[in-house]
Design a protein with these regions (language model features):
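Flexible, low-complexity junctional segments that flank or bridge functional domains
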Residues: 1-187, 194
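C-terminal "post-core" interaction segments
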Residues: 103-111, 133-321
C-alpha cells in the first residue's frame, strides 16, 4: 500500500458527498446540508458508467483480499475526483460529476451534479448525514467500554487491540469479570465490529474469563462482527467462537481468517512517498477456504434503523436473550 505526500493531498479535489455500500447497493450517506434531500439515495451511474463498472475499476486501486474489505476501501475513493479521471470516467478534475440516483422511497432515476472542490475547503462546508442519532451501543472513541443494556444484558465493546493508559486492559478485564461474577447477567454481547486489530493477546484473559464464568453461570454470549473487524480482532472473534459457547452476529468481516500481515514500511527514494507491505501470511483457520469470517446470524444494517438510531446487530442479538 502506498501513501501520499502532503503536497499530493493538497492538490486533490473531491465532491461533497460520501457513499457507502448498503447490502450491495451504493447509497449516499453524507451530502451538503443544502443538498440533504438526496441522503439515502441509491447511485446507479457516474457520468453514465454503471456503478458495478465503477467499483470494479476502483477495486484495482485498493489492497484487499475479500469483497467486504474491498467495498469498505473503495467507498473512501468514490468522492475523490482523481479516481474517476484515472479510470477514464471523467476527463479532468474540474468538471462536474454526474450521478444518476433514485431517491429513498423514490421510483424514477434522476441526474444530480456535483462540483469538485479542493480538499482543504471541505472543513468550510455545512454537511448533513443520514445518521443523525447514534445508539448507545454505536461506535465509541473509547478503546473499550462496558455497559448494561436491556435487562440482565452486559455489552462489552472492544474497539482496538491495545491497552489504554486511562484504564489498562488488565484493569478493564478484571472489572468486567468481577461484574459478571457479582451481577450474573443472562447474556454477554462482545462487540468487535469497529476493531481494526493490534495485539490479539491482550484480550485473551477476557476470553478465558468469559469461558470460565459461562461454565459456572450458563449465560449466553453473542459476538458482534462486521466490515470493520480486522486482523487481531478477527483472531479474537475466532477464539471466542472456539473457546466459549457463543454465536457470531452481524455481517462478514473486513479481515480474512487467513491473511497477510506483520506490516513493514519503506520510503520511496525519489518521491519520498511511504509504502507499506506485508511480510508474513497468517493462518488463523486451517479449515477456511479464504475470505471473510461469516456470522452465524446475519444482521445487515438498513437505512431505516440508521435513521432511527437503532443498532441492528444488537437488536438481533437481543431477540434471543
Amino acid at each position: 500500500m502506498v501513501g501520499m505526500s502532503p503536497r499530493i493531498l493538497a492538490e486533490i479535489k473531491a465532491i461533497p458527498v460520501q457513499l457507502q455500500s448498503m447490502d450491495g447497493v451504493w447509497t449516499i450517506m453524507v451530502a451538503e446540508a443544502s443538498n440533504a434531500d438526496i441522503l439515502g439515495a441509491t447511485v446507479l451511474t457516474v457520468n453514465g458508467i454503471p456503478m458495478e463498472e465503477v467499483v470494479a475499476g476502483a477495486s484495482k486501486l485498493v489492497s484487499h483480499d475479500n469483497e467486504t474489505w474491498m467495498r469498505l476501501q473503495v467507498a473512501q475513493l468514490l468522492n475523490i475526483v482523481d479516481t474517476y479521471v484515472y479510470l477514464g470516467i471523467a476527463e479532468n478534475g474540474d468538471e462536474d460529476l454526474r450521478m444518476t440516483v433514485v431517491r429513498h422511497h423514490g421510483e424514477l432515476p434522476e441526474e444530480v451534479r456535483f462540483t469538485p472542490i479542493p480538499r482543504e475547503e471541505f472543513h468550510e462546508l455545512d454537511m448533513a448525514s443520514w445518521v443523525s442519532t447514534l445508539p448507545p451501543t454505536g461506535q465509541s472513541s473509547d478503546l473499550y467500554r462496558a455497559l448494561t443494556i436491556a435487562d440482565d444484558v452486559l455489552f462489552v465493546q472492544y474497539n482496538a487491540c491495545r491497552s489504554w493508559d486511562a484504564m489498562p486492559i488488565e484493569v478493564f478485564t478484571a472489572r468486567v469479570l468481577d461484574f459478571i461474577k457479582e451481577q450474573r447477567p443472562k447474556k454477554i454481547i462482545v462487540d468487535l465490529r469497529y476493531n481494526g486489530g493490534g495485539d490479539s493477546r491482550l484480550f485473551e484473559p477476557m476470553i478465558d474469563g468469559l469461558r470460565e464464568q459461562q461454565r459456572q453461570q450458563g449465560f449466553s454470549i453473542d459476538v458482534l462482527i462486521g466490515e470493520g473487524t480486522f486482523s487481531s480482532a478477527l483472531l479474537n472473534a475466532i477464539q471466542l467462537k472456539r473457546r466459549t459457547d457463543s454465536r457470531l452476529v452481524g455481517t462478514p468481516t473486513g479481515g480474512s481468517a487467513n491473511h497477510f500481515g506483520e506490516v513493514k514500511y519503506l520510503v520511496l527514494p525519489n518521491s519520498g512517498i511511504r509504502a507499506t507491505y506485508s511480510t508474513k501470511f497468517f493462518t488463523m483457520d486451517g479449515t477456511s477456504k479464504g475470505g471473510s469470517l461469516e456470522p452465524d446470524i446475519i444482521a445487515k444494517t438498513n437505512l431505516e434503523d440508521l435513521a432511527a438510531g437503532i443498532d441492528t446487530q444488537v437488536a438481533a442479538a437481543l431477540l434471543d436473550k
